[in-house]
Amino acid sequence: MGSEMCIRDRAKIAGLKMCESFNLQYGTNYIAVMPTNLYGPNDNFHLENSHVLPAMIRKIHLAKCLNESDWGAIRKDLSLRPVEGVDGTASEGEILSVLHKYGITGPSVVLWGTGKPLREFLWSEEMADASVYIMEHVNFEDTYQKGTKDVRNCHINIGTGKEITIAALADLIVKETKYQGKVIFD
């Protein structure tokens, strides 16, 4: 996953720089926006490749289902989103094995890291609203100080300005899902 993140980060930076360069070289009015961590409708909840918030929600949900022996809910979840080919028709042993691989058991759920990093999250529809607002009200020349020799970093960061620790986010998910097990950070 490290190399995927590196490629994705480089692609984002290249896109930002492309907009900036076109504006300077050709007089276009492209505005590049950089969102914070997004979540919302049609999010990716696959354990193999989801982002932090949907991964935590799903892991804690599945741990709760295991803790309560709610095999109907577990099978429904895995039928919608199989994990490593294990779907809702698999045996309990196969299901337990694959979930355990991802740190999901009934009594506990393991989340990556220390829980201390701060992250900012934004509802995807609010990101869309902010993008439309920027298209209608902001010009490239508004993104840098006039008379500056080097025009750089002309993108606009979009977020809430409110950060939360991963541990506090996990606590919020635990509270909302009413999970009675333990969250462990590795």
Positions of predicted regions on the chain:
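Short, small-residue-biased leader/transition segments that mark boundaries at the very start
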Residues: 1-7
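Phosphate-handling active-site elements
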Residues: 2, 26-27, 143
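Active-site Tyr-X1-5-Lys
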Residues: 8-36, 52-68, 72
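A short small-residue
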Residues: 34-38, 111-112
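Conserved sequence/active-site signature of Rossmann-fold short-chain dehydrogenase/reductase
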Residues: 38-40, 127
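Active-site loop immediately N-terminal to the catalytic Tyr-X3-Lys motif
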Residues: 45-46
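C-terminal substrate-binding subdomain of Rossmann-fold SDR/epimerase-dehydratase oxidoreductases
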Residues: 62-186
